[in-house]
Each structure stands twice: as C-alpha cells, then as structure tokens.
Amino acid sequence: MPRVLIVDDENSMRMLAARAIAMDGHEIVTAADGAEALEILGSEQGAFDLLLTDIQMPVMDGIALALAAARDFPRTTILLMTGFADQRERASNLSAIAHDVITKPFSVADVRTAVADALAAGKST
C-alpha cells in the first residue's frame, strides 16, 4: 500500500485530497506546511512513495519543500498543486524533481488520477 504525505495549509483541501486518495487504499499522512512536512519526512526517514504538496504556504512553501525532499529523499515522487498561475509558472522549473502540477480546485477524480499517474511514474524510475 503506497504511503502519501499530503501538505496544504488549507485544512479543507488537505481533507479533500486525503479522502480522495484513501479511496484507492493508500496510507495517508498530512501536514499543514512545508516545515511540518519536512519534519515528518525526516522522522519517517523518507518512507513515503509520494509527496503531494501545495506550493503557496506559510513557514516553508511547497517549492522549498520539494527541493529539500528531492535532495534528502530522492526516491519519493513529488506532485505539486496550486490554484495560482504564477505559482504554476514557478513550478515549471522543477520538472527534474516534480512529476507534475495539479491545478486547484480539483475534483476527486482529478486528484486520484494525478496520484495514480505519479505513483506509476515513480515505480518506473
């Protein structure tokens, strides 16, 4: 069963993504910002198949988190999400470390498909 770490400062988005992804039997852990997520990744020694993170967050944004996670836990696949065009543009420079960027708001089907694609891509690398 794949383990997914979901990071978003908006509780409603975190819970929507968690419920959607749990439908496929994945184990879910959540964090409210990048610093908390990095702490969880470290304490769990990067034992996650996927990091699904919002880009715009307080304390540590998703891009800083993605860079740190890719450096410290290169086996963890990274999937970004944002509702802002400028943040999506910032993320375009991360194609070497991030599988894709999901545009918010998204449907349950959208996030399930994006996660399935990212997990499949992670297994093939």
Language-model features and meaning:
Residues 30-50:
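Acidic, metal-coordinating helix/loop segments flanking the phosphotransfer/catalytic sites
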Residues 15-23:
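Charged docking surfaces used in two-component/phosphorelay signaling
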Residues 106-119, 123:
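C-terminal output helix
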